[in-house]
């Protein structure tokens, strides 16, 4: 059995799940990030499944999502990449808050996520060596190129607009896989993707697999590709994530 609560950590609304009676017991912990226009509540089945596996789970609401949503859905659609960047930046204070609660067992902290949340997890892993392992479900580590086709912040039609676009996208380069293959390969990494994904193409995960493989950095890499699956989490994907974290965290 498990327990689950809504609360704030570092002023960030989160879902917090853990095995029953172990709220204050140090445990291996997974920070799991949800997808765009969704919320931690919608993705709470990950919290349930991982807590049932004996892990502590923290699921933050992304900026302008869940209980942080401003109510302006049209504006949010143009803020995907800014939201992603802020989510990655918030990891440092979120991790510190978890440690302050004395919730971590032997610093065993992992990250994972789905869609935008998977991008968040990959970016965090690229910059934070304390992350023990990472699960990316239908994500991408190639932010600056994907920003031209997936929820672009604007369609540049003038030199000024191109400059604005570049200013939004440029900070993402510090977090993306292109510049951090070594950091993404020195601990266990799971890539799961539906091969018929119609939002974040499976080629995004396949590209990362190829980059790691071609440079001999795939020894800790686990890949799971599901034919016929579009942009959604399947029972098989959930099982793959739970199995991965149980094995490596």
From Swiss-Prot:
A Pfam entry, by short name: Peptidase_S9
Function in brief: Displays esterase activity toward palmitoyl-CoA and pNP-butyrate.
Superkingdom per UniProt: Bacteria
Organism encoding this protein: Escherichia coli (strain K12)
Listed name of the protein: Esterase YjfP
Record Gene3D superfamilies: alpha/beta hydrolase (3.40.50.1820)
GO molecular function, one term: serine-type peptidase activity
Keyword annotations of the record: Hydrolase
Gene, per the UniProt record: yjfP
Cross-referenced PANTHER family: DIENELACTONE HYDROLASE DOMAIN-CONTAINING PROTEIN-RELATED, POLYKETIDE TRANSFERASE AF380
